Amino acid sequence: MRLPDIVGVELTGRAQPGITATDIVLTLTEFLRKEKVVGAYLEFYGEGASSLTLGDRATISNMAPEYGATAAMFSIDQQTIDYLRLTGREDEQIALVETYAKTAGLWSDSLKNAEYERVLRFDLSSVVRTLAGPSNPHRRLPVADLAERGISGVVENEPGRMPDGAVIIAAITSCTNTSNPRNVIAAGLLARNANRAGLTRKPWVKSSLAPGSKAVSLYLDEAGLTEDLEKLGFGVVAFACTTCNGMSGALDPKIQQEIIDRDLYATAVLSGNRNFDGRIHPYAKQAFLASPPLVVAYAIAGTIRFDIERDVLGQDASGRDIRLKDIWPSDEEIDAMVKSAVKPEQFRKVYAPMFGIQDQRRAAVSPLYDWRPMSTYIRRPPYWEGALAGERTLRGMLPLAVLGDNITTDHLSPSNAILMDSAAGEYLHKMGLPEEDFNSYATHRGDHLTAQRATFANPKLFNEMVKNADGTVQQGSLARVEPEGKVMRMWEAIETYMTRKQPLIIVAGADYGQGSSRDWAAKGVRLAGVEAIVAEGFERIHRTNLIGMGVLPLEFKPGVNRKTLGLDGTESYDVIGERKPRADLTLVIHRRDGQTVQVPVTCRLDTAEEVSIYEAGGVLQRFAQDFLEAESAAGADKKAG
């Protein structure tokens, strides 16, 4: 087992009035990305950490994948105990937690003198109201800088037409933000103030509230804020993954057609964790992350071109101009409402039944699943047959794609709505499904014939092998098949290579595999025939998933990359050397002109266990081997006895 780096993050100061946990975590995400904490365990401490509620701490911890850390932890203190009591835990359990933490040295007072090899410092008082975007959660965008960054500008107000920069989706969503009572209550109070001032949501904005817990609805009802949110269009649509994961549903057809006809720059604003290009909605060209109350404000503004701090949201009954500061609730108002409306019995009502003894026995239908050959949702998987059953030679590999930095799992295998003109859409249409039943890529992950067609299906992809006449990289789900040099849609290229049984490789830049821990981001490339990926760096979760599918992750040495090597996709590749944890291997590049270049790379199988899984062909193959060996040993013992 490779021990992770333990990094101390000292939080100093206190957040300024009006600053939400979302503002803090988006600012921290930018800071920690720059500090390169990928794969590290972070321990937050200091006076700033002590001042944060447990809900605020959880918001910070839940964004760990966005800043690349494996874990983000706060020590146990009185805030922890108060939260356990607030959320309905039994007194005996609360007492046990406190006693155990103090006895085991896990209470915050016991950890004040902890020493770390690496310490980062962050001042909470430096945080300002902020968005993140477009394209990345670590791309912080202070609202005071909207004009300077070229986001806000002249707002078009032509009757009957959407403005450029129209916010077509405004969603209070994600488990990270909606599980924080202060964030949700703040949104409700802002909605109440907006309604009292006579402000309304713009008609082209599709708004929604998708809490991470049913308890949210209970305390919004208790606070009397549900109706205020619903009046602005923020009614509860589900307690599940929705807009965050590209499942906001269809737009009004007239709005969708206007976006297409006028080629509008349409956007989404949501309180989610991720805003990668193409993730939120096919017709939202870009997405911005914001706190729940800011999401409500942007639904009223109706356009990202709006300077949310300075511009006028509307007028009240007396004709007075209303700006954000006029409807933003005070911290004291938020805290008072949380204290009066959020109650332990709400959490007990929601969660206690989950842990109750249920005796609902059902008759056994069949010892084995009855596979349906025409299903597009669940199909017998191919992981022990076909290409995955063959030997990986790591020889003569051709590049499927040459990619830049910050490639996300949404680029590798999007999860949003399936469109008719996509490879998956065409397949589902041939299977007899009407377009309204296509659903999303995520819902078809149990059918490999649909899901593998999502591989690199993101229309925002830039494959550096595919260029325009002027030499710029062409955007789209495209590939160039070698040796012909023919450009085609990515799925057709994959089919071509699969027919030829051609081993493939992917070449990429830094931070490859950011975002959701999406298994199909690894499954898709392996089923396509990809045997290795060489990049400047990998996100931890995706690297692990690649190994689990039998794909070899290789890392360029510092200072070496696709650009310094002049790679253009016409090359073929071999990998030679003994695969050991973090061993130096040799990437042999065969150029079209006959030249051969040998480049040292690091084998990113970081432990002996990862080597074992990779050599078995992946985690499923390893499981099958272990199972068969155990069965064989049990049979031998029985025979001997």
Give names to the regions the model predicted.
Residues 54-76, 135-137, 168-186, 239-244, ...:
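Conserved phosphate/anionic-ligand binding catalytic regions in large, soluble enzymes, centered on
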Residues 316-330, 542-613:
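Acidic, glycine-rich flexible loop/linker segments
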Residues 1-107, 185-186, 191-206, 235-349, ...:
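Mobile "lid/hinge" segments at catalytic clefts and subdomain interfaces of large enzymes
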Residues 120-224, 228, 360-534:
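Non-catalytic terminal/interface segments that mediate subunit docking, oligomerization
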Residues 285-287, 584-641:
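Charge-patterned, long linear interaction tracts outside catalytic cores
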Residues 283-291, 295, 301-304, 308-406, ...:
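Extended hydrophobic packing segments that form well-structured cores
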